[in-house]
Amino acid sequence: MIRYIFITGGVVSSLGKGIASASLGALLQSRGYRVRLRKLDPYLNVDPGTMSPRQHGEVYVTDDGAETDLDLGHYERFTGVSARQSDNITTGRIYQRIIEKERRGDYLGATIQVIPHVTNDIKEFVLSDPGEGVDFVLCEIGGTVGDIEGLPFFEAIRQLGQELGPQRACFIHLTLLPYIPAAGEMKTKPTQHSVKELRSIGIQPQILLCRCDRPIPVNEKGKIASFCNVRLASVIEARDVGHIYDVPMAYHAEGLDSEVLSHFGITDAPPPDLSSWQRIAQTIKNPDGQVTIGLVGKYTDVPDAYKSVSEALGHGGLANKVKVDIRFVDSEKFDDPDAALEDLDGVHGILLPGGFGERGAHGKMRVARYARERNMPCFGICYGMQLSVVEAARNLAGIKNASTSEFGPTKEPVVGLMEEWTKGNEKVTRDASTDLGGTMRLGAYPARLKEGSMVAQVYGSLEISERHRHRYEVNASYIERLEKAGMIFSGMSPDGRLPEIVELEGHPWFIGVQFHPELKSRPFEPHPLFASFIAAAVKQSRLV
């Protein structure tokens, strides 16, 4: 029997529903249960693929090529369960699907309405394809209770709660308890009003997860329980912690997983095994050293734009038992060829993340040259790899007009638009006029590594699979000239047509990858490239 847990949020946005969902999933996993986590996003975009990182943060790509919300990255990192296209839905995708069915005549002339057609599609999404042997499906509802665009989702889960019954459905509401210094007390009224709003649409939460920055007094917990109609033990203190990987243990200490099991009447659950989380906490609290990594991109004012990269760097630190201090550096500042690169002083490694467009790209190329000439560890990802190759083509291979066609027409397209590639058994064709949404090379693709290369040593294998999200690729017709200049194309697509990994001959650690390795890194299994990169940064820190 599959049980469903719905996580909603109130009072304000950005309370951490994604981390809360991932943490609860990890706690249930630690007791031997199998979980699947899903995200329901109320916005009208079909997916976040064309949304600005400044508005939405990063786009998280799954193995099967879905462009999804960054919360799915939290789900994967905390539980190790690979997300799928079927684990993220938006209002836009639901409406798109319904309109397609209406145009085909599937509704046989019926009037299409939010209730029942939209809500039925939402319910179908929640219940469909949970996976084999899954015990719990956790569904996070994006946005805040009371948002107009979220009403169909709340109505759908209300109906599911009624249809499944309390033995199979549980509602958890994440809320805020602000502390007012002038009054010297914690205020429960926002939580009461948030729950009142939720109850007005027919949902009675069984558990309240109360975000706060200090302990909740017992009398305040009692007041919340009384006015929100929940058990006292179901008012869970979700106090701020030092690191997100402390959250599962903090929530367990407050009894969150026990309350969930109690609601479902499960009395024979095995005790949780949190030893792996405890080891991570110890490493985070007691590192053997510290390194500073310069993350050079154009969205550095919005750290969520590089969420998975930041997390993967931290995982690399865990693998090497060091703290990783990330210095976010705006690449646009370096577009001016006369601008000093003093922001890179004191860093022990440089990471050039993915991105799009010409703005900030020339600055990234200057930074790639800086790292290349100073023998500093440098890790280029996706666009970062492409720009590193363009820089080397200009300044090592002597191809003065080398550029990327992403900037516009060029005589020397060292990086060009991919027009054809293979996805499974299907040939995919694109051109410059193709729509932007969902038209990139997306999802997991295999690659073959060059025997004896640095990456082959790092991976410990000659065959790998990594996730991609790109429209441009290094032009294979330039490989011979670039290799003569000292570049090593150490990873290629199985058909030998698409360069996937590049190294720099004679450099202690200079690797560029066309894929996004950060998407497959986990705290318990740091990605080998990030572990190796941080190891190189540790070595660099001892040289300066």
Curated annotation (Swiss-Prot):
Query: Catalytic activity annotated for this protein?
Result: UTP + L-glutamine + ATP + H2O = CTP + L-glutamate + ADP + phosphate + 2 H(+); L-glutamine + H2O = L-glutamate + NH4(+); UTP + NH4(+) + ATP = CTP + ADP + phosphate + 2 H(+)
Look up the domain of life of the source.
Bacteria
Where is the catalytic site?
A: 382 (nucleophile), 516, 518
**What EC numbers are recorded for this enzyme?**
6.3.4.2
Q: Does the keyword Nucleus apply?
A: no
- Which residues does the annotated region (Amidoligase domain) include? 1-266
Keyword Metal-binding annotated: yes
Q: Which amino acid positions bind UTP, per UniProt?
A: 13, 187-192, 223
Instruction: Tell me its family.
Output: Belongs to the CTP synthase family.
Q: How does it assemble?
A: Homotetramer.
Q: Per its record, how is this protein called by name?
A: CTP synthase
Which species is this record about?
Hyphomonas neptunium (strain ATCC 15444)
